[in-house]
Every structure is written in C-alpha cells, then in structure tokens.
Amino acid sequence: MTTNTPLPHAPAAARSSRGRAVALAAVFLIVTLAGLMYVKWWPYYHKAANAADTHSIGSSILGGASSESMSDIWRSAYNYSIAYFKSVWKAAVLGIIVSSMIQALLPANWLAKAFGKASARSTLIGGAAALPGMMCSCCAAPIAVGMRKRQASIGASLAFWIGNPTLNPATLVFMTFVLSWKFTVLRLVFGLILTFGISYLAERFADRGKLGDLPNRLAIPEEPANRAPLALRWLKSLALLFLGIAPIYAVSVFLAGCLQSFMLPAWASEGIVAIVLFAVIGTLFVIPTAAEIPIAQSLLSVGTGPAAALLLTLPGVSLPSLLIVSRSFPKRVLLFVTLSVMALGVLCGIAGSLWL
C-alpha cells in the first residue's frame, strides 16, 4: 500500500511566499511614507508654523472671469486649471503610484481582511487610514479605486476617500490659526459625520448582486501561475491607471473651473439662498488641499453661513473626483454621497450662521 506524503519542499515554499509578501509590503510602506513625507508632511509642517505667525496660508485661488462672455469664462477656467495642477501635481502622481502599488505589490487577501467587510468596523478602519494621507479628494480618488479593485468594501473605500480631505489634520491646524477654533469645530463635527456616517450608510445603497463586478471593470486581470515579473506588473498597473484617470481628470478640472465665474451671483448674496448655492457649487468645484480656507476667508463679507458651507463642501468631493471613482462604486452610492455632501454643507452653513 502506498500513502501520499506531503512534498518536503512545500513548507519551505509557503514560507518563501509569505516572506516575499512581507518584503513587498515593506517596499509599499517605505515608498508611501517617503512620498507622504516629501509631498505632505514636511511642507505642511513649515506651512503650519507660518500660519501660526501670519494667520494666513496665502490668497484665494479663485480668479473668476472679468466679464460674463464665454471667452472670458473659458480663459478663467484655463488659468484656474493651470494654477490647480501646479499645486497638486506631486500629490496626484503620488496617489496614482500608491494605487498601482496596492494592485501590484499587496496580496488581495490582505486588503480584504482589513477593509473587506461591509461593517462599521471596516468603515472606521478606512477612515482612520485616511488621516496620514492629507490628500485632496482628487488625489485620494485613485487610491480608493485601487482599494476597490482589491476587494475593499464600499464603506471603507469611501471613508478613506472622503476622510483624506475632510479630516486632514494639517487643514484643521491651518483653519484654527487662520480663521478660528469655532470653524475648526464645525468642520471636524460635520467631517466626522460625512466620513464615517455617510460612508457607512452608503454601503446600504449598494446593489449586492452587482458588487462583485464593480471593482473588476478597470481591474488588472489575474496573472497566471507563472506571473509576469513584478516590475512589469507594476508598470502595467501604473499605465492603466494613468491612461484611465489623466484625461478625465484634466477635462473635468477645466469644466469645474468654469464654475468659479458663478460663485457669487448678485441675486444670492446672503441668507439661506446663498448657503444652498455655495453648498451645491462647493460640492462640484475642485480645489487643492486646504484651499478652502483662504476662499472662505475671502468670502466672510458675504456671511459666515456661506463660508461655513464651503469649508465642508469644497474639500468633501468634487466633479473630477466623482468621475475618477465612477466605475468603482455603484452610481446610486455616488449620488447618495453627492447629495449628502450638499445637504450637510447646508446644515453646516446654517450652524455657522447661527454660531460663528
């Protein structure tokens, strides 16, 4: 009688596979932390020190058209797009690199274990993971796409995407120095509701029968047993991400830039009408990280309500970031998130008009 005995090299192969996964995860962590240090943490440290001394982080990025003619509106949108991309290009590149590394370097089951369950815990972990990133919604969007391709849950991916701009610790510090602690409290309270509450509720809007297909619409096909070299797989992931995101990003930023010419019409300069208007436009408009602070500061003459509405809606989501993630989340989920940002922006504006 013959018996099947395990191959002697099987345990060694398993250990080798685990060791390789740990090594690749270490590479991912080192590159990500180094990128954040260069793009975010070190510059923001100096920016916070300057804000403490001067109570300013610069002037508003908004320009607006000199007239209502279409040529001036297009020119204004073009100038805004150039200023915007000059401000965010490093973070945008970092976001795409991190997303590609998530897909090429990290084992899929690792993210599924940490972020894969449709639960409050998974949403909480996703939001907490966003805090060191300090990215704007557009720069965090590719990472959320990468998380979805690796089977992270809707709630966790949304919390990471939304939490990056709305709970940005550096922005909260800047806001305290430039505006006041009351603005910071409003932003923090409504930011927590948006990041964790809305992200968790959005999971309930998903069609469970279609969830399995969504992350794979732009996903890299599974590699066969004799997988391609790691560098080739990473470059493939990076190229597909760039080609899928860059055109949408550029065009949508230009279109969003057209909105700055309509930020303050004469017929909506105060009261609830102004708050609603700013909440809607702020949700669709796109800004670099922390740019909502000088924008709100420059609009305080209109009222604290509209300024408070913009402090939440401008960073929360934007038309470009919604388009970037549009194939990774169900449409009804993104519609719910968009309307929720607008509604919370109105509530934040009303609270600001009464308290600030």
Whereabouts are the PLM-identified features?
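Intrinsically disordered, low-complexity non-transmembrane regions of multi-pass membrane transporters
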Residues: 1-29, 46-71, 207-237
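Juxtamembrane and boundary regions of transmembrane helices in multi-pass small-molecule transporters
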Residues: 19-48, 113, 117, 122, ...
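Structural signal for alpha-helical transmembrane segments and their membrane-water exit/capping regions
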Residues: 28-72, 94-106, 202-203, 252-263, ...
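Transmembrane helical segments that form the transport core of multi-pass membrane transport proteins
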Residues: 66, 78, 95, 101, ...
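Helix-boundary and loop/linker segments of multi-pass membrane transporters
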Residues: 68-70, 81, 85, 112-118, ...
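Individual transmembrane alpha-helix segments
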Residues: 74-99
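Alpha-helical transmembrane segments of multipass membrane proteins
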Residues: 99, 103, 133, 194-199, ...
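Membrane-interfacial helix-loop connectors
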Residues: 130-188, 261-334
